[in-house]
Design a protein with these regions (language model features):
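Non-catalytic, mobile gating and regulatory segments of ester bond hydrolases
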Residues: 1-164
């Protein structure tokens, strides 16, 4: 069965003017937010391109290999390598990266904003990673009304709406 890697091979040479943003593109936008781009994607509202961010990520993390932890899809890093070079995705702007881990509060949160060529801004939340903090936070979702990362997500959306309006 075809997957997002196949899609990038198939449509990676086509601009968004030729083929508008679709559900698979939106899925790829979410995958862009999986790695830790600390020091690569600005947190202050300035932007970098997908090509710049992914290139810097692999250049500064030589030991990353082809897999992004135990629970992330094995296709995430190979897909990022492909989109960084593709005509379709390489010039998309990224901004507002945050990666927050507070062990004492059982808090794990990460997000960035993707500036889609159709003018829509997408927020990519990483979700649970393979740290103990992330898994403990997941368990707390079952017994708490609100966990710290949910408050972080709300604050991030408010910040992004104000910053990128």
């Amino acid at each position: 069965m075809a997957n997002a890697l196949d899609y990038v091979d198939w449509r990676g040479d086509l601009s968004f003017d030729t083929v508008p943003v679709n559900e698979i593109d939106k899925y790829i936008f979410t995958c862009i937010g999986k790695p830790d781009y600390t020091g690569i994607i600005p947190a202050d509202g300035k932007t970098v391109t997908v090509n710049e961010a992914v290139g810097s990520y692999f250049a500064t993390r030589e030991d990353v290999g082809d897999k992004l932890g135990l629970i992330s899809s094995a296709s995430t890093l190979p897909m990022l390598r492909k989109i960084a070079l593709s005509d379709r995705f390489r010039d998309i702007k990224l901004s507002g990266f945050i990666n927050k881990v507070v062990v004492e509060k059982t808090e794990q949160f990460s997000a960035l904003t993707v500036f889609s060529p159709d003018g829509v801004k997408y927020v990519s939340f990483r979700g649970t990673d393979d740290t103990i903090v992330g898994w403990k936070e997941n368990c707390e979702l079952a017994v708490k009304e609100v966990v710290p990362a949910q408050l972080d997500a709300k604050a991030y959306l408010e910040w992004a709406a104000e910053t990128y309006d």
